Amino acid sequence: MKRSRTVLKKHSTRPATSVLGLFLLIVSAMPGLPAQDKAPYPWDSRALPTIHGQENAVIQWNNAALQTIRYRRPWPTIGARFLAITHTCMYDAWAAYDDKAVATRLGGRLRRPREERTEQNKIVAISFAAYRCLSDLFPEDVAEYDAVMKGLSLNSSDNSRDPATPTGIGNLVADSVLEFRHHDGSNQLGDLHNGAYSDYTSYKPVNTFDQLVDVDRWQPLRTPIPDGGLYGRYLVQSFVTPQWYRVTPFGMKTGSEFRPKPPASYTRSKERYVRQAQELLELSANLTDDQKMMVEYWADGPTSETPPGHWCLFAQFVSSRDHHSLDDDVKMFFALTNALLDAGIAAWDAKAAYDSVRPITAIHFLFAGQQVRAWGGRFKGTQTIPAEAWQPYQSQVMAMTPAFPEFISGHSTFSAAAAEILKSFTQSDAFGGSYSFDRGSSKFEYGLTPRARVTLEWPTFTAAADQAGMSRRYCGIHFKDGDLFGRETGRKVGRRVWQKAEALFNGNVSKLKT
């Protein structure tokens, strides 16, 4: 019972693991660690995706970054930053070989004469920039990045900083971008608080896993740790990267620039608060196979590309569909990944500002002592259950309720921002992607769900983004407010990032002040 692709596969000969975000089995939310170590089960191979001739250097380096994300499993905020830095380094190196584009850090100071603006020089420059960047961010994976360089017939040990050579330009721009990003508020170096990417804001939850003090606020959950398929040990969640609102954005002035108004509150807007909880129970009780497969497809948990990487795979599809040049992909991935960076900052600003309750806590509180109609668990369908027993449709096997506050939805924010960029770059909302599941191929209810072949279709980028956000309501980890305000925030972020990216492409320095 294999999954199969439709439209999205016909444009690519890459292995399935490197195309369009296969959702993967997620066994734990793995709370507490901002950057997780390794996948919970051993992999047969850690090889990078096979490099095919039709994949330009931008796609090859994007795949290298995505493979690192799949294996190292950084949280979505960290993964988005990782992708943005990688593609910013490539863009800044490429800008030296364009007649008008300016780099983010060095402007037009490294611009080379027209006779040097060859395809090969661009490949060399962006590859050294990507290599230095990736090696800095994930030095433990340098052997994999060496393999990509070798495949491009480049010597990764060449440390030249000669600005008259593409190698030197690549290394120089990587130095400049990394120096800036080492001090961007993410705490990559652990110099603001001990431990890379650790919290330095002294965040402490109001509620504990076993005591609910404020029903409007986030409650960390006690979650099982996978142990050979048996669940006998537990961890208590910690807010993942609560400091992220302090990270320097690309296009926004600050992380709070597009902060939405507060979500529904039990103490201030009880009717709307209760209604949204009831809506989730109704969705849970009436889940269709199509909706269940939407949940699984968009899960994007710790052993996949995460939501930011998922949209990079959509961009790879666009590159193939529209027959992109190297120049096209440098610019598209630069704008896309920086929108994902800013989307993460904006979403986590709202999460930190409102510290809002997750549905599982709210539903257990609101309907305590009552029987509710809802999804009853794996293979059980809809049942009447105690409200305190209600769980999202992805508990344990898929990504359990994530380790950070609810409002706003990261999926919704990331996806809406990415869709805005792809719409702007292609000058059209047309997407044309789809993904099919064979009967019984569910990772969660294998053999039962879906009962017949299901195909998810996205005629537009907007439709894909909306489905990503809605999927989090179907599974029960986000309220309507968290989804819709996340979409709105993401669209604002995407438009702002595109405005700045386009100014950089066109060398309009006067428009770059934010």
Task: Please annotate each region the language model reported.
Residues 18-29:
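Bacterial N-terminal signal peptides
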Residues 36-514:
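Acidic/polar surface patches and capping/hinge elements
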Residues 15-18, 415:
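Alpha-helical and His/Cys-centered functional microenvironments
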Residues 1-14:
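N-terminal secretory signal peptides that target proteins for export/translocation
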Residues 30-36:
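Signal peptide processing junction and immediate N-terminal pro/mature segment
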